Structure formats: structure tokens, C-alpha cells
Amino acid sequence: MENVYISSYSSNEQTSMAVTATDIRELLSQYVDDANLEDLIEWAMEKSSKYYIKNIGNTKSNIEETKFESKNNIGIEYSKDSRNKLSYRNKPSIATNLEYKTLCDMIKGTSGTEKEFLRYLLFGIKCIKKGVEYNIDKIKDVSYNDYFNVLDEKYNTPCPNCKSRNTTPMMIQTRAADEPPLVRHACRDCKQHFKPPKFRAFRNLNVTTQSIHENKEITEILPDNNPSPPESPEPASPIDDGLIRATFDRNDEPPEDDE
């Protein structure tokens, strides 16, 4: 492993030192056993190089150290002045991780992949202390196939483009409670998406019988043998009852008076 250059922070001075693989092993041996040491270092090296995200560094033009000490430490490291377009870095007043102070000072003094490597080491040490697995690749996921086997290729909807059953249903948009959601299927092989199949009802209206014939292959309509409801009497016209007066257009001839 390459040398890791560290700048250890203190209240009055800042010293620079180089930490080799031997020094890191000696430091880690204080927290973990030798049986877990090599696996932890190998895991931290792999994950730090794979998932390294370059942090956006703030320049000196918009970051200034505060000239005052905060009365109450509320855990906020940065404060922003919107009026003057400046940001201020607050110095922490409460020391944390006293048990891992040496490793935390090493993290503060490094940058880049070396800093990420030490952060993964600190995370792994804390997990080992608590007796939990730090490597997510070794954690077995819960299988829900006994409850619902949605992504089974045997029952999946085939893709109309490549005829593959390696498809996944996705809910694109949710709507009101009385409307169906917008669902699309995505094919993992040809990277195409398509609409789910729908049941089509072939309507054949007959004027004489007013019957609707559904597609027999999809569904069957059970006959309605219940007696018809009694015919209700036709309601009286409001005009005949004199409730509404007949109106005429001004271009029409006036009605004749009853003699």
C-alpha cells in the first residue's frame, strides 16, 4: 500500500507526517483483532477506490474562519451570509470520537482517496466493535418469493420487441383513487419499454335486440334472468300543469286569443 501523507491537527501547531501500511496496521491492531485486520484493510481499499466521490472544495474567496466562538454547539459546521455572499466555518467546541481520536486526526489531515480509505476503516472498526457486518456484499437480502413472485420470468409479460420475459413493471404516475395508475413495462434485454396488455371488448350493437356481444376468449357475460322492474308512470309535463308558461320568440307570430 502506498504511503498516506497525514497532517495532524492540534490547537497550536500543525505537523506533517507520512503513514505507511505498517503504521496503519499497528494503529488498527489497537481496535480490532488480527483475524479481521487484513479483511478490513482489503475491503476499505476496494470500496474507497470504487465509490470515491470528489468533494467540491470551497475556495478562500467565499470561506472565512469565524472570529468568534459559538456559545452553544448545535452541530452546524457551516453558516452562510446571504447578504454579503460569504460562508463561514464554525470551529467545533465539543470533541467527538475521543476513543478514535488518532484515526480522526488522520482523516482530517488527508484528502482524496486516502481520506476515504481512512473513513471506511473507521466505519469498519465501529461495526466490528458493535458486532455487526460492515461489508454490505456479505449481507444476505431477504427473499420475498414465497409471498409474491412478481419478477419471475415464467409469469412476466413478454416484450413485443425481442419476445423476452426479462421485464419489469413500473408505476410511472399515480392518479386519483377512482382512476388506474399509469403503468409501463421495461425490458432489461433490449432496453425498450412498452404498455401493458389490455383486455379488448368487441362491441356489436344490434338495433333490434340491443345486445352486446363480448369476446368469448376473454370473458363471458352471465345471463340476467332476474325479472324486470315495474314500469314507472310517465311524469306529467310542467307545461300542462301550468307551472311553466310557454315562451315565444319575437320573430314568431303572436298566439291567437281564445274566444
Curated annotation (Swiss-Prot):
It catalyses: RNA(n) + a ribonucleoside 5'-triphosphate = RNA(n+1) + diphosphate. Zn(2+) binds at C159, C162, C187, C190. Its main location: virion. It holds the Pfam family rpo30_N. It is found in: Virion; Host cytoplasm. One of its GO terms (cellular component) is host cell cytoplasm. SMART domains: ZnF_C2C2 (SM00440). GO terms for molecular function: DNA binding; DNA-directed RNA polymerase activity; zinc ion binding. Residues 220-259 are annotated as: Disordered. Residues 226-236 have a biased composition (Pro residues). It comes from the Viruses. A zinc finger (TFIIS-type) spans 155-195. Induction: Expressed in the early phase of the viral replicative cycle. Keywords: DNA-directed RNA polymerase, Early protein, Host cytoplasm, Metal-binding, Nucleotidyltransferase, Transcription, Transferase, Virion, Zinc, Zinc-finger. Its EC number is 2.7.7.6. GO terms for biological process: DNA-templated transcription; DNA-templated viral transcription. The DNA-dependent RNA polymerase (vRNAP) consists of eight subunits encoded by early viral genes and termed according to their apparent molecular masses Rpo147, Rpo132, Rpo35, Rpo30, Rpo22, Rpo19, Rpo18, and Rpo7. The same holoenzyme, with the addition of the transcription-specificity factor RAP94, is used for early gene expression. Belongs to the poxviridae DNA-directed RNA polymerase 30 kDa subunit family. Part of the DNA-dependent RNA polymerase which catalyzes the transcription of viral DNA into RNA using the four ribonucleoside triphosphates as substrates. Responsible for the transcription of early, intermediate and late genes. DNA-dependent RNA polymerase associates with the early transcription factor (ETF), itself composed of OPG118 and OPG134, thereby allowing the early genes transcription. Late transcription, and probably also intermediate transcription, require newly synthesized RNA polymerase. This is DNA-directed RNA polymerase 30 kDa polypeptide. It comes from Vaccinia virus (strain Western Reserve) (VACV). The gene is OPG066.
